Amino acid sequence: SENWKTITAAFIDESYLIGYLTTEEYYHFIGNLRGISKAEINSWVQTFEPFFNGEILGQKKYLRDFSKGNQKKAGIVGSLIGNPEVVLLDEPFANLDPTTQIRLKSLIKLEAEKNGTTFLISSHDLTHVTEVCDRIVLLEKGKMIQDIETTSKTLKELEQYFSN
């Protein structure tokens, strides 16, 4: 079935971006694919200005000319266009400055709470995932070796597991 395509989105890395577009053009392109007007996209994307911190919108720059961190910010927000039920993010905290990492954690929590979005996050950053995830699945050589519900003790348990 092709039904999963309408409820799923992903941002894996900058290769998911269309480098010869500006951020606004990229968002309009995704919006068009999802049946959302330019006006709706323009209004919606303004809600992410605190996350963008003045570095993304209105820059008149091509996506390929942004830093890796700013490309990541643009791509993550692009993956949220149309309020998908499931969003896959690969190493979303990499290449982001500490302030943006904190903002991203808040953004993920807010989207999950407000829209019921499920985030599947692939990450090597134990601290961030224990702060934003309800469940953590450990994979080794493609096999699930642990499925953990996140508690206040999860970070310590993971640190102990990986130090052995």
Question: Can you annotate each of these PLM segments?
Answer:
Residues 78, 82:
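Conserved signature/switch motifs of ABC ATPase nucleotide-binding domains
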Residues 98-100:
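Helix N-cap at the start of a conserved alpha-helix in ABC-type nucleotide-binding domains
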Residues 122-124:
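H-loop/switch region of ABC-family ATPase nucleotide-binding domains
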Residues 102-114:
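Helical segment within the ABC ATPase nucleotide-binding domain
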